[in-house]
A protein has these predicted regions:
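Bacterial N-terminal signal peptides
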Residues: 12-22
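N-terminal leader/linker segments that initiate helical-solenoid repeat arrays
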Residues: 24-55, 60-65, 72, 306
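Helix-start (N-cap) detector for alpha-helical repeat units in TPR-like alpha-solenoids
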Residues: 26-27, 60-61, 94-95, 128-129, ...
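Structural signature of tandem alpha-helical TPR/SEL1-like repeats
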Residues: 39-47, 72-85, 107-119, 142-160, ...
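Structural marker of alpha-solenoid helical repeat scaffolds
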Residues: 55, 89, 123, 164, ...
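TPR/TPR-like (Sel1-like) alpha-helical repeat modules
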Residues: 135, 139, 154, 265, ...
Length: 306
C-alpha cells in the first residue's frame, strides 16, 4: 500500500512538472517578445510572440503584444484584428484600449477611434495623449458621426490637457483650430501665440497664426509671421500660398507673385495657388500668363470633381 501510494505521488509530481513546463515556456516566449518589442527589435519580437500565442490563443496579454508588434511593423490589418480581440477579451485593460485607439487614430479611422479612445480615457483619465487623440478624432469624424456638440467635446478634452500640462505639445494649436472653425479669430490668436511661445519651431502653428492675422486685417504682421514659417518649412506649399495672399493684401504685388510662383513650384497640383497667381498676373497687366494659370486652375478643378 505504501509503495502504491509512493507511486501515485511520484506520478502526480511528474504530471505537475509536465503541466508547468509549457506554461513556463509560454511565459519565457512572452517575456522575450516583450523585451525585444521594448528594444524596438520588432522582427525578432514577432516570432517569439507567435510562439507564446500558439499555445494560448485566448490570452489577451499575448494577443495585445502580438498586435502591438504588428502595428509597429505597419501591418495594420492584422494589428487591428488582434488589438480589437484583446480589448474585447479584457475590456478593463487601459493599455489595450489605448493602443487600439491609437492604431485607429494612426490609420485615420477617426469615427471608429472615438468610442475606443473614450474608453481609454475613462480607464486612465491622466492619459493626456489619449485625450489629445480623442479631441482630434471628434473633429475629423464630424462629417461621418454628425455629433452636434463636437466642438464642446473637443474643447473639454483639450482644456483638461491644458489644466494638467499647459506645455503639452500641440494643445494650444488644436484649441486655436477649434476657435478658427467657430469664427473666433481673436481667441485663436491668443492660443497660437501661446503655442509658439512654448514651441517656436512649430511651422504649422505659425502658418495658422499668419492666416489668422490676415483675417484680422493685420497684413504686414501676417507677412512677417509667414516669412518666418517659410524659413522654418521651405517645402510647405500652403505657407507660400498664404504668404502670397498676405503680400497681395499689403499691396506688395511683386512679392506676392514670387510667393505664388513658389507655391505652384512646390506643388504643381495646388489649384488655388494657380488661381491666385492668375489674379496676380491680371493685376500686373500680364494677360497671357493670367490666362495660362486660370486654365491650369480649371483643369485641376475639373480633374478633382470627376
Amino acid at each position: 500500500m505504501r509503495r502504491k501510494w509512493s507511486t501515485i505521488e511520484f506520478t502526480r509530481s511528474v504530471l505537475a512538472v509536465c503541466l508547468v513546463l509549457p506554461a513556463f515556456a509560454q511565459q519565457n516566449f512572452y517575456q522575450s517578445a516583450l523585451d525585444k518589442f521594448q528594444q524596438k527589435q520588432y522582427e525578432e519580437a514577432l516570432p517569439l510572440a507567435e510562439r507564446a500565442l500558439a499555445d494560448d490563443r485566448n490570452n489577451p496579454t499575448y494577443i495585445h503584444l502580438y498586435g502591438a508588434i504588428l502595428a509597429a511593423m505597419d501591418q495594420f490589418y492584422l494589428a487591428e484584428e488582434n488589438l480589437r480581440k484583446a480589448t474585447t477579451l479584457a475590456p478593463n485593460e487601459r493599455a489595450f484600449a489605448y493602443d487600439f485607439g491609437a492604431l485607429l487614430h494612426r490609420e485615420r479611422k477617426y469615427a471608429e477611434a472615438v468610442p475606443v479612445l473614450k474608453r481609454a480615457v475613462a480607464l486612465d483619465p491622466e492619459n493626456l495623449t489619449a485625450r489629445m487623440m480623442l479631441a482630434r478624432s471628434y473633429v475629423f469624424s464630424f462629417h461621418e458621426l454628425q455629433i452636434p456638440n463636437f466642438e464642446e467635446l473637443t474643447l473639454e478634452q483639450l482644456r483638461y490637457i491644458v489644466k494638467k500640462d499647459p506645455r503639452f505639445p500641440g494643445v494650444h494649436h488644436h484649441i486655436a483650430l477649434v476657435y478658427i472653425n467657430s469664427g473666433e479669430p481673436a481667441k485663436a490668436l491668443e492660443e497660437l501665440n501661446t503655442e509658439l511661445q512654448f514651441y517656436p519651431t512649430n511651422a504649422q502653428a505659425r502658418l495658422e497664426l499668419g492666416e489668422t492675422l490676415l483675417k484680422l486685417n493685420q497684413f504686414h504682421k501676417a507677412a512677417e509671421e509667414l516669412r518666418a514659417a517659410a524659413q522654418q518649412a521651405p517645402q510647405m506649399a500652403p505657407i507660400a500660398f498664404a504668404l502670397a495672399k498676405a503680400y497681395r493684401a499689403d499691396g506688395q504685388t511683386a512679392k506676392a507673385v514670387d510667393a505664388a510662383r513658389r507655391c505652384v513650384e512646390l506643388d504643381a497640383n495646388f489649384a488655388d495657388g494657380h488661381y491666385l497667381l492668375s489674379q496676380l498676373y491680371r493685376d500686373a497687366n500680364q494677360p497671357e500668363q493670367a490666362r495660362e494659370e486660370l486654365e491650369r486652375f480649371r483643369q485641376l478643378k475639373g480633374a478633382s470633381s470627376q
